[in-house]
């Protein structure tokens, strides 16, 4: 148990890192 939560947190962290690097591009990619 707890694996799903860990994956979710990891995905959020990766998403934040990508957003910092790509800026608006990450927003558009996330919208699709």
UniProtKB/Swiss-Prot annotation:
Highest taxon of source: Eukaryota
Catalytic reactions of this protein: (2R)-2-phosphoglycerate = phosphoenolpyruvate + H2O
Cofactor detail note: Mg(2+) is required for catalysis and for stabilizing the dimer.
Keyword tags: Cytoplasm, Glycolysis, Lyase, Magnesium
Enzyme Commission number(s) from the entry: 4.2.1.11
Major localization listed first in the record, in broad terms: cytoplasm
InterPro entries, A to Z: Enolase-like_C_sf
Name of the protein in its database record: Enolase
């Amino acid at each position: 148990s707890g694996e799903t939560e860990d994956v979710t947190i990891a995905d959020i962290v990766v998403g934040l890192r990508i957003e910092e690097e790509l800026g608006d591009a990450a927003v558009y990619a996330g919208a699709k």
